[in-house]
Curated annotation (Swiss-Prot):
Family recorded in the similarity comment: Belongs to the metallo-dependent hydrolases superfamily. Adenosine and AMP deaminases family.
Reported function: Catalyzes the hydrolysis of the free cytosolic methylated adenosine nucleotide N(6)-methyl-AMP (N6-mAMP) to produce inositol monophosphate (IMP) and methylamine. Is required for the catabolism of cytosolic N6-mAMP, which is derived from the degradation of mRNA containing N6-methylated adenine (m6A).
Annotated keywords: Hydrolase, Metal-binding, Nucleotide metabolism, Zinc
Gene Ontology biological process terms in this record: adenosine catabolic process; inosine biosynthetic process; nucleotide metabolic process
EC number: 3.5.4.-
Reactions mediated catalytically: N(6)-methyl-AMP + H2O + H(+) = IMP + methylamine
Cysteine-cysteine disulfides: none
Residue runs in coiled coils: none
Annotated organism of origin: Xenopus laevis
Marked site: Important for catalytic activity: H226
Entry superkingdom: Eukaryota
Protein name: N6-Methyl-AMP deaminase-L
Organism lineage string: Eukaryota, Metazoa, Chordata, Craniata, Vertebrata
């Protein structure tokens, strides 16, 4: 495949997105809307960086996160962000999305509970508006908050798990991997598992985390985020293989975050050759200026995947969602209905 027809194939391909941080997924267009609401904030200097898109340096990407926190401090902001992000994923052909975000209190008076309620309201409004995407939510534990904040997040997740009509499905463990240790979070994560919540844990994002990774694999998690350096330990690889734990792989994020030096060296190839379950994801589509169609295209070009290989990756990803068996069956039916039209652009 080449040219516009190829790009159209990846756009038309129905896709599953399972590793998308809400704040990191905010697009340039949405950031400009938010900044226009807050003229009192001295962040106009950030406009140049925001407009750079794919040319942003890693440091500028980190600066973007700081600006995002400044301009998303009210319920109105969170509602706008949630709806815009969902609609952008839908426009890119994503049919099932698990968003994740850390509930936070803001100086503007937003509580953690209200934060989650607002995200769920955004999901509901998109559904009412007929946006063609099924969206669920994972509450994220930020490592920087330590075990106390983690316990609060688990309690919130348990409450919403019971009351949200299957919108809240689980928890994410993320944040700066150099802060704290996995053992700090074993108790709240175990409690979450016992409550029926699913666990998606960022593991082995940096080298020399073998001990922590092995500890957290003992839970075990239902999915692994990134897992960039899992392959440095044959013992860890065997544990992951034996338990068939799906990985969430984010190619552009790893390249821009400089944890992987080139597309060819990305661990996609390692796990693909093992026929191990994984799903392609964006991580932070706004900050890293990508989308899921682009991630599939990069993987296909780098690892010589045919359109049928690409289709299989997308279809198999349905099994790695945290959705119910009924939802998975409905998604598979939807994929098969769409398949003939999708492959018209693959020829």
């Amino acid at each position: 495949m080449a040219g516009e027809g190829a790009l159209q194939f990846y756009r038309d391909l129905p896709k599953v997105e399972l590793h998308a941080h809400l704040n990191g997924s905010i697009s340039t267009a949405t950031m400009k809307k938010l900044m226009a609401r807050k003229p009192h904030l001295d962040i106009q200097h950030g406009m140049t960086m925001i407009d750079k898109g794919q040319k942003r340096t890693l440091e500028e990407c980190f600066q973007m996160f700081k600006i995002i926190h400044q301009i998303t401090d009210t319920a109105e902001d969170i509602l706008l962000v949630t709806k815009d992000v969902i609609k952008e994923f839908a426009a890119d052909g994503v049919k099932y999305l698990e968003l994740r975000s850390t509930p936070r209190d803001t100086p503007a008076g937003l509580t953690k509970q209200a934060y989650v309620e607002t995200v769920l309201e955004g999901i509901k409004q998109c559904k009412e508006e007929g946006v063609d995407i099924d969206v669920r939510f994972l509450l994220a534990i930020d490592r920087r908050g330590g075990p106390t904040a983690a316990k609060e997040t688990v309690k919130l997740a348990e409450d919403f798990f019971c009351s949200s009509n299957e919108l809240v499905l689980g928890l994410d463990l993320s944040g700066d991997p150099t802060v704290g240790h996995g053992r700090d979070f074993m108790e709240p994560l175990n409690k979450a598992r016992q409550s029926g919540l699913k666990l998606a844990l960022h593991l082995s994002e940096i080298p020399s985390q073998t001990e922590e990774t092995e500890l957290l694999l003992g839970l075990p998690p239902d999915r692994i985020g990134h897992g960039t350096f899992l392959t440095t330990s044959a013992h860890i690889v065997e544990i992951v293989k034996k338990q068939h734990i799906p990985l969430e792989l984010c190619i552009t994020s790893n390249i821009k975050g400089q944890t992987v030096s080139s597309y060819n060296e990305h661990h996609f190839g390692f796990w693909y050759n093992l026929h191990h379950p994984f799903v392609l994801c964006t991580d932070d589509k706004g900050v890293f200026a990508t989308d899921l169609s682009v991630e599939y295209e990069i993987a296909a070009k780098t690892f010589n995947l045919t359109p049928h290989h690409v289709w299989d990756l997308s279809y198999q990803a349905i099994d790695y969602t945290f959705a119910s068996a009924d939802v998975k069956a409905n998604l598979k039916e939807k994929w098969l209905l769409l398949k003939p039209d999708v492959f018209r652009h693959a020829l």
